[in-house]
Amino acid sequence: MDHLALPIRSPPTSERNQQSRNFFTSYALPSAAEAINGPVREPIRDFAPIADRLIVGVDFGTTFSGVAAVYTSNPDDVEIIKTWPGGNGITSDKVPTEISYELPPDAPAGTKPTVKWGFQFRPEESRLRCIKLFLDRSQKLPFYVSPLETAAQLRKFNKTVVDAVSDYLTQVYNHTMDTLTRRYGESFMASTKVDFVLTCPAVWSDHAKNTTLQAAERAGMGAKSSIQMISEPEAAAVYTLKAIQPNHLNVGDNFIVCDGGGGTVDLIAYKIISLKPLKVEESAVGTGGLCGSAFLNYRFEEHVKTRLGKTRFEEMKTKKGKTWQMGLRYFEEFVKRNFNEDEHHEINIPFPGLADDEEVGLDSGFLVMTAAQVKDIFEPVVKEVCDLVQGQVDGLRAKGGIVSGIILVGGFGQSDYLYRRLKSFFTSAAPPPYSERPTHASANSIGDHAAIEVMQPVYAWTAVVRGAVLRGLEGNMVISRKARMHYGTSYATVFDEEKHSVSERYWSPLWERWMVSDRMQWHIAKGEAISPLTPIAFHYTRNFRPGQSLVVTDDLIACEADEPPVAYTRDLVHVCKLTTDLNAVPRSLFTRLTTTRGVEFDNLDFTLEMIVDSAGLGFELKVDGVRYGRVDADFQ
């Protein structure tokens, strides 16, 4: 179950340096400090402006997933899929991100298990939950998700996490295509191209992004290089800034997108560069936390268990499952979204079939909860969200930025209580006069307690998936992003007794010098801005003896610390292995060199150019400015 393991660290010596010790083959010149942000992809291309195209956005969420579609000839008519298998005719903007496998008791060996997903489960049935989080081995899991139980369920059916995600996305894909066929007809669908835009968390690792794309490709959504990917807060920003018009945001202002989901809350800050057309740049590295609305459900469950007593509560869940589900659904659909302590002094949770108990607070099939009791469920989770947002605000203000808005989206983003808490938390200062827009200088003079407008769009729960289809329609709104980590490669260099230990040196028979390996060249700095329009160049010099393979490998390495080391250490993260085939380069571009001992070898100077988009990266091989092919990357 390698998908449940911790992040794989690099071996003590990278493959590139193992080759370097045999014959010195590389030297990396310094390059501009830029950034990296996703899986291997072709250079970014916006969708071609052609007619007869359907764009489908898929918001693959931790607890719920959603799908939206739009026809390019009618761009204002974004449709949300609301009917799902097992939904019993009840419409829902999203479907649970849950899946299970089943085999008949007498099934022969090799029988393919049947799949249940989404709304197809009875309350007591076992299923895989939060499988998305297992794609990123650096992500923490909520307390209610057991890695051991998940691993056991997968192992029983010889499945991996990627298999489960792919199987779930396959069900989403098949239902989406069936729904679109009913909507538009078979002949229309047969002649119309369908492009998919997939969302991912802001804090997703490069490995997780690449694996998510692989799962989507296996599900039938297209080739990895053709599936567009956009971060969830970015998609929410695309939709919200267009939906909330007019708003008070001006060029130069920063706003924070707070995407509150079921399991996680993700935040990204953006600075407005232009309003028409709308262009923004990422102004702070994305952050996130395990403080989604599912934690409210579990706090509610603990509250009910405490009130009823463990024995009576467990008996209700096992023998009166529908009673518990009705109470939980009421909490989910009404209390979580609409609770307001100023208006709701008493909440009555339906638990039909439970006997009256004045001491417990059970009356006529209802459990009576005071506003203070409900607030006690909300407050610890909401405080975590406020602290996350405050961290983004503090970081922006420390750099002299104006923070003018917080955009609240996602399922948890619908919560009236969360909206009011954020509003009171960030609008304690009196707003500036309406008639006079403050300059940056005067706004900064207000201090750290300047009011920040909190905005909540009408369709907060589907803001991400609506933004995904808008991205497919209109292309990239974000012109630059921030690096989550330092990224670089290791290299060998000439031994310098003032810098290096004698124990580190080795003799290079080709360069005929003492060398040291495992030096780090950090091409990309943590927190640096990058643009998909500006490739990042890695320069190399490599030597080849006669008959030596021209297929070379390099390790792409990352560092999460604020200050990266000058030499390779075991705690650096191995991102991927880059494989470059130099056979396409004309032999005339190689330089023939000879050592003093008469040993001939070929030398080649070449460049790897990295192109970054919203959730991916691609590499090209260039020699003297001429492109000679794509570089493959294997994420570890």
Task: Report each predicted region and the residues it spans.
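Conserved phosphate-binding catalytic cores of ATP/NTP-utilizing and phosphoryl-transfer enzymes
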Residues: 2, 28-53, 223-258, 276, ...
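Glycine-rich phosphate-binding loop plus the immediately following alpha-helix
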Residues: 94-104, 126, 272-318, 362-386, ...
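Acidic low-complexity intrinsically disordered segments
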Residues: 6, 29, 42-43, 356-371, ...
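Gly/Thr-rich phosphate-binding beta-strand-loop-beta motif of the actin/hexokinase/Hsp70
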Residues: 45-78, 124-126, 242-282, 487, ...
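Phosphate-binding loop and its immediate beta->loop->alpha context
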Residues: 14, 23, 73-217, 292-343
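Phosphate/ATP-binding catalytic cores across multiple sugar-kinase/actin-like superfamilies
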Residues: 167-187, 235-246, 251, 375-403, ...
